[in-house]
Amino acid sequence: MEQRKLKLRDLTLRDGQQSLFATRLSQAEIDKLLPYYENAGFYIMEVWGGAIPDSVMRYLDQSPWDRLRIVSKAMKGKSLLSALSRGRNLFGYVPYPDSVLEGFYKEAIANGLNVMRIFDALNDIDNVRESIRMINKLGGIADGAVCYTVDPKPEAPAEKKGFFARLFGSKPAEPEKIFTDEYFVEKAREMERLGAKIITLKDMAGLVTPSRAASIISKLKANLSVPVDFHTHCTPGYGLASSVMAILNGVDILDTNIWWFGGGSAAPAIELIYVFCQKLGIELDVNMQAVGEIRDHLLDARKSLAAFDLNKDKMPRNFDPLADKLPADVDACLLYTSPSPRDRT
């Protein structure tokens, strides 16, 4: 049986630095990393969009268009380059007319962009419809992102007065759930029908639990014919576990960062995903030696961002999964808690 391969989208140069370091990574620091990225073999690299254009112009006095062109030239087509778009709001904060959308997407693709991840924070399909259509028309890859969220907790009822009122009072009915698995599947199917070539479950707040990641990803895989991507953050502490559950349930692409830009309020580190995939018999479709070279240089890049690094005094120790050994108790725990191949079918 052929070993399963998991494709990766590297977020380090966009979402990683935005989540941890206020999007202040300079072009000079990025230029030092690009020769190593060329050989890493990431399926997709997210390098643009989100807060990048605003921050690059506002705080670094640099051109976001230059950044896209420089990265595209350096990568030589070896990884697809992606950006994050707020649908009708593009990279801004107000809705734009169709003429602006089309002109912007045309220039983005002409300057080296391949994949546009398109989302609306309220999952309003009308706000992503034209973006998906235009990206496809212009020769790009439309990545439809379904935003994950949870139902609000019902307010506690007012305390009833008196012993018998509290004893015999009826319990208020639970409100009907809105954000069910079926809700996310239907939003994904709508985007697929519009022409999205990738569907992402986008958990930008890190709210999706491991069990919920498993149930939603398995249903997306059963109901879609396009690749499924999983995006989460480690803010509450279980982003890594949720990512592993997404892997176990057949996700095609996983979003990760490289060590010094991973974890915390960012996406999980690829190095830890690699450890779990080794235990599970799943191959990462990436050159981990090249990833190690990027990691070595990323530490200097992180040090250059000390003014924006809330954890500069308590950074994790370096970890090279190709050379370092996990502590025996941790390694045994991973071995005995990893599902068997039979469990993964």
Regions inferred by a protein language model and the residue ranges of each:
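Hydrophobic faces of well-ordered beta-strands that scaffold small-molecule active sites
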Residues: 8-11, 45-47, 79-85, 116, ...
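Conserved, mostly hydrophobic/aromatic
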Residues: 16, 118, 199, 250
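Active-site beta->alpha loop and helix N-cap motifs at the rims of alpha/beta catalytic domains
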Residues: 49-129, 146-184
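Alpha-helix-loop-beta-strand connector modules within alpha/beta enzyme cores
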Residues: 58-82, 133-144, 214-230, 280
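Active-site-adjacent beta->alpha loops and helix N-cap segments on the catalytic face
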Residues: 61-65, 121-138, 181, 206-220, ...
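Catalytic cores of alpha/beta
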Residues: 238-249
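Glycine-rich phosphate-binding active-site loops on the catalytic face of alpha/beta enzymes
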Residues: 252-266
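Conserved small/polar residues in nucleotide/adenosyl-binding loops
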Residues: 336-345
